[in-house]
A protein has these predicted regions:
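Helical "lid/coupling" subdomains associated with nucleotide-phosphate turnover
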Residues: 33, 56-84, 95-105, 115-137, ...
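A generic fold-level signal
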Residues: 14-16, 26, 151, 196, ...
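Ser/Thr-glycine-rich phosphate-binding loops at phosphate-binding pockets of nucleotides
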Residues: 26-28, 135, 150-156, 206
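N-terminal glycine/serine-rich phosphate-binding loop of ATP-dependent small-molecule kinases
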Residues: 1-20, 24-29, 34-94, 105-118
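Short glycine-aspartate micro-motif
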Residues: 19-23, 144-148, 201
Length: 354
């Protein structure tokens, strides 16, 4: 069945001001503070604390006392930061671990008291849609599959002609031990996945970013730029195979990821084998970017990033520097380039001093 996008996911409307988004995930709790309701593309503050709320939830269906304690301490710290930075609008959201736990009120009630704000527990569809919206608002995707692998869930979204066509959220994540048979059974239950081969696979979440980091380290890739990194499908499968066999360490993988990297690699590898993509593209976006996009309805899907230039130029060290550089270059390229390149040259000049 095709997916019809609602007009809004969380129905958030805010006046122009600083906003704080708190992403309470299965593995970590993250605070990101943006100026100007998130229209400015670079955050004022960004911090993540590993709380592992989803740890052992697959065994007990409950959040553990220790994980709740860790998460509440993280929120206490974040609450102080939010107050000191004079942020009026706080948007806390929780995903798979809190959503699936029978005892989630033992965490939610004290957490809301600490933050003085209601925590939105995202449904599976909301989480998947926000993950897709976050990527589409920051990356040009016409057709492809978005895979957001977290600690407690895997969201799969089919994109057709730049829009969400189908989506699903599976209860597998790098904190949930599953064998290959279980992963394959869950992936086979997604009927549209098998029919969506030879598309680009866009991977988001810490596990996919770890794959990107491992690729850079193990292939001597010249640039350490993970967002937008494109990896050959065969290379991805081979690298994930090595990650599955790794024991105590693996080049490019953060040490705190090693305890769950085998499970994450197993999920990613079987996903890649199931949908047989053209390429695997690593993306640094998240549901937080989706929330920012929803707050700013004028920020259309697959936007022209030149609209962000006015925010970048505000942070120039020397006012008017972009105009000076352009005046120097214009005579050199006047008869050599077309209108499209001239536009790009102008943007490059505007970005030259930020």
């Amino acid at each position: 069945m095709s997916f019809k996008k609602t007009s809004q996911i969380l129905k958030i409307k805010l006046k122009k001001s600083k906003i704080a988004i708190i992403d309470i995930g299965s593995n970590s709790v993250r605070l990101v503070i943006y100026p100007d309701s998130g229209k400015y593309p670079y955050p004022l503050f960004n911090e993540r604390i590993n709380c592992r709320l989803g740890e052992k939830i697959h065994k007990t269906n409950n959040l553990s006392v220790n994980s709740i304690s860790r998460a509440l301490k993280a929120l206490q710290r974040f609450s102080i930061i939010i107050k000191n930075m004079e942020v009026k609008h706080v948007i806390p959201v929780a995903t798979a671990a809190v959503r699936n736990a029978k005892n989630n009120k033992e965490f939610i009630l004290p957490a809301e008291k600490i933050l003085s704000s209601k925590i939105r527990i995202l449904t599976k569809n909301q989480e998947a849609e926000l993950a897709a919206l976050g990527l589409l608002s920051n990356f040009p995707v016409k057709n492809g599959i978005i895979a957001d692998l977290g600690g407690g869930s895997l969201e799969l979204i089919l994109i057709s002609k730049g829009k969400i066509k189908k989506l699903v959220s599976l209860d597998i994540g790098h904190l949930v031990p599953v064998d290959q048979k279980e992963v394959l059974q869950l992936l086979e239950s997604v009927k549209w996945l098998e029919k969506s081969k030879n598309l680009k696979l866009y991977g988001t979440g810490g596990s996919f970013r770890s794959l990107g980091s491992a690729f850079i380290k193990n292939t001597s890739y010249p640039l350490f730029l993970i967002h937008g990194l494109s990896i050959n499908t065969e290379t991805s499968v081979m690298l994930l195979d090595k990650m599955i066999e790794a024991k105590n360490k693996f080049p490019g993988i953060p040490q705190n990821r090693m305890p769950t990297i085998k499970n994450a690699a197993n999920i990613m590898q079987n996903l890649i084998l199931s949908c047989d993509p053209k390429k695997v593209i690593i993306c640094g976006t998240s549901i937080r970017d989706g929330i920012v996009s929803e707050i700013n309805p004028s920020k259309i899907i697959n936007p022209d990033k030149s609209s962000n230039i006015k925010y970048f130029t505000k942070n120039q060290r020397f006012s008017g520097m972009q105009n000076t550089i352009k005046k120097i270059l214009d005579p050199l390229v006047e008869n050599l380039i077309d209108r499209k390149f001239k536009r790009l040259l102008k943007l490059a000049c505007q970005l030259s001093d930020i």
